[in-house]
Amino acid sequence: MKKDYSIIVGGAAGQGSRKAGLIISKIFKKLGYFVYIYDDYQSLIKGGHNFSQIRISDEFIAGRREKIDLLIAFDKKTIDLHEGMLNTGGALIFNKNKTPEEKGIGIEADAIVKHLQGKPIMANTAMIGGFLKVVGIEWAAAKTVLEKEFGGKDNINMTIAKEAYDSLKELIKIESNKKTKNPEYLMTGNEASALGAAKAGLDIYYAYPMTPASGLLHYFAEHEKELGVLTIQPENEIAVANEAVGSAYTGQRTMVASSSGGFALMSEVISFTAMAEIPVLFVNSQRMGPATGVPTYSGQSDLLFSINPGPGDFEKFVAAPANSEEAAIWSGKLLNLAWQYQTPAILLLDKELSEGTFSVNKSIFKDIKKEKELTWNKKGEYGRYKITEDGVSPLAYPGTKNAIIKASSYEHNERGLTEEENEGVITAMQEKRLRKFEEMRKIADSSDSIKVYGNKKSKIAIVSWGFTAGAVREVAEKMGLKFIQPIVVSPFPVKQMTKALQGSEQIILVESNALGQLGTIMASHGIYADKKILKYSSRPFSIEELEDRISKAIKA
């Protein structure tokens, strides 16, 4: 029998519900479960309502359910908002000192903390300890995780958690899951993207904080020395992009990240990198727009903008992973591809992927390596934009003997000198870059640019991308349907998509935007969806919602 549990940990901003949810998730990871965490929070420092929805399973998961099995409430508002989500037989665990009139499993969290002379915030530790007892997790199994989180066995948090644990009785038993070897890490999409790029030789990371991309900056800053990546926060997004270009010009592998509006500020610089053939990896972690939109919530409405982010004809690599493993793999791939083809590359994330936490296999990082770019052999006169058969010119960097290295946003000749009069030179340089683009399209149409799951013989094909693809994959597999997930969205892998769709009599597209933007891209290549399932409320699809809407689309 499949093991699948959903838990909500909720409270006001500042009460520590998010941290508590992460600690609980780490304990379940240690017990052998796949874990997915959906974090929901408002743009507030204190007050309001935050919650983490944790889902654990003995199979890979990447979506949330509408119904839950356990509710851990730090305040009354959490009970009011989420108690109705409990399944029959589900349990409410609450802070009895905050809401004494509630029916459920009350923990004297505040009283325990006061008795042990702890700080008020440590009530969340008491809630964790009580929860562990209620679900039948042995103290010894959780102890090592708690000690690591709290800084040792003698920490007061350990004493608080143990007293709360001992104060309750076991209600249900969540057994350990040791049948298969499950992933070793829990990582957000931001953390995985950072580590993947670092493994591919990233030298410098530039960013100005903007939710939900800020986690990348935090991760690089915290792990700067061990990753060997210099981390810099300039004064705004325009400065971020320009400084990154300057560093890449000198041979330093650079990466920048922002979200939607901040990414928009970088658009002229992205076009500049295409003209100057300077490789930079850009990350756009989408929020629900337009403009400032809904800052701490999600959407997939930047797809068309991300594949057309600046003026002029230029190709770029754009990949949209669905989970943390794919984010790590593709941040590394894109960094290498940017340097191989001397072009901008864009990693397209969204809030749910950037800040969601997923199970990650340690082994994937072994295959992410720095791949060597084409460099000048130091023979003859150096031409930064030398016309070649495949359009890729050898690189040299400032300080190289007998080489003058120019970079300009103007059209130029092979030596990098501005050209406005000679139409032959202008045409030749445009065609040089176009040849490079043709090579890029071949790479984009490789077998790993699209994934196919589920029943590959099904006449019904579901297509989705980015974070939304995770939940859609789960539902499609359950319903016996074919599921197709394009990861590379520019250049669009037409051959691979056409091959994946062979035999399909109905194509259903699922996206978290109002216009069906992937559908627009597919249609531009002669591939049309029969039905579109769209959501643009800033919240992700649930498993139950997808089951219902896909069933209706099939019957319609």
Question: What is each PLM-predicted segment?
Answer:
Residues 2-66, 70-79, 83, 211-308, ...:
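Thiamine diphosphate
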Residues 1-200, 204-206, 495, 499-500:
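Active-site cofactor/cluster-binding pocket
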Residues 187-190, 339-556:
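Flexible, low-complexity linker and terminal segments
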Residues 38, 140-142, 154-160, 171-178, ...:
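Flexible, glycine/charged-enriched surface loops at secondary-structure junctions
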Residues 169-181, 197-201, 221-227, 283-287, ...:
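Gly-rich Lys/Arg/Thr-decorated short loops/hinges at beta-loop-alpha junctions or inter-strand turns
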Residues 38, 93-95, 107, 257, ...:
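Generic beta-sheet signal
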Residues 6-12, 129, 204-206, 255-258, ...:
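Short glycine-rich or small-residue beta-strand-to-loop segments that form or flank ligand, phosphate
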